[in-house]
Amino acid sequence: MKASISIDEKKDFIRWFLNKHQMKTREAMWVLNYIAGHDQIVKYVHFVDNLEGCARGLSLSAHGVESEPFLFFKGNIMTTDPEKAFHDIRLNWDEELYVELHFEEAITSPEYALVREDNPFTAVKLADEEKEMADALIYQSVHQFSREKVLQQIDEALDARDEVTFHKLVRILQQMDTVKE
């Protein structure tokens, strides 16, 4: 997760984007200009790779890519009408707005990378190998913690000169070490 992206960084990106790319609809340009002109709105804007799971999103496309020119959705309602989107953005300026931009070379754009954030609603997908590594790390951590706890209890049993507890804990420690191997 990257650090918070400043309002100025987002505004600079929008200006760069509009200077570099021609939107498929002029209304998309108007909406982006409106957003960039209002810090209180920019504060709630998040640029993401996909809008999956987002409660409120705006998908905009520049010429040169195969995707819808303009989509706005809030909850289960989706529209291609820029006026409805503009109206919602203007009235609900203090709600999170996730923006997905489609343009040539978006994936390799350093400017876009600076403002792009992880979609907090998208589940992280791990490969089987990564899951196995995570499971092994968790198992190892729990084992190490448990072993240290038993060693601490052995020290306490020695300090208390409690032979019965000491021998019981040594057997537990030996079993733990056998299972680990």
UniProtKB/Swiss-Prot annotation:
Transmembrane segments: none annotated. InterPro entries: IDEAL_dom, UPF0302, UPF0302_N, UPF0302_N_sf, Virus_scaffolding_prot_C. Pfam families: IDEAL, UPF0302. Belongs to the UPF0302 family. This is UPF0302 protein LMHCC_0635. It comes from Listeria monocytogenes serotype 4a (strain HCC23). The lineage of its organism: Bacteria, Bacillati, Bacillota, Bacilli, Bacillales.
